[in-house]
Amino acid sequence: MSAALWALSTPLHAQTRGAWTAGFAGTLGGGWQIEAADIGYVRALRAGPVRVASLTARLGSFVDEGAILGGARGFIFGLTLGGHTGLLSLADLGTETSKSQVGVDLTVEGTAYVGTRSPFPEGSPWGAVTVLPGLKFGDPDGVQFGLLLGPTFFFGQASDVRPFLGVRFEAPLARRESHP
């Protein structure tokens, strides 16, 4: 809550470098998987190949993909710190005044999880490192949509590797109007 108040109380110029992010995060496959919602804050950063840093909260549950009814069990909470490379543009769509960009980037995330009634052998708490190549679409200075898919490495009392799917929306905190 304090972080949200801090972000909203910053001057307009500082807010142009930040954005809100929301989306879906889940592991893929049969058996027990994680399905969660993400909400967080991203900020432009210039640190070598890392162009964007993100801090995200993840809230969800364990879901048995083999169950037809009643497959949810327990809850998870995760705190994720991520670094994103710059967008490698593949195509520009639209006009000069209303353009959209399609591109790829790479995201590396570290997540600390706690959970209740975990069916995973990692126990609770546990950690994860995720490497996510992603496809992004949208206004470079506005709302963007991203689809990320890659491996996540769980570690705790045991280790495991699972496929990870992320669907993300980003919206800037403030937008400067273009001047003629």
For each of these PLM feature ranges, what is it?
Residues L8-L69, R168-P180:
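Short glycine/proline- and aromatic-enriched beta-strand/turn motifs that initiate or cap beta-hairpins
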Residues Q33-A36, G103, T107, A158, ...:
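Intrinsically disordered, low-complexity regulatory regions of eukaryotic regulatory proteins
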Residues H13, A25-W32, G66-A72, R117-G123, ...:
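Outer-membrane beta-barrel domain signature
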Residues M1-S9:
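Bacterial N-terminal signal peptides
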Residues D38-W126, L132:
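Gram-negative (and chloroplast) outer-membrane scaffold detector with strong preference
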Residues V50-A53, V63, W126-P180:
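Predominantly the C-terminal beta-signal and adjacent terminal strand-loop region
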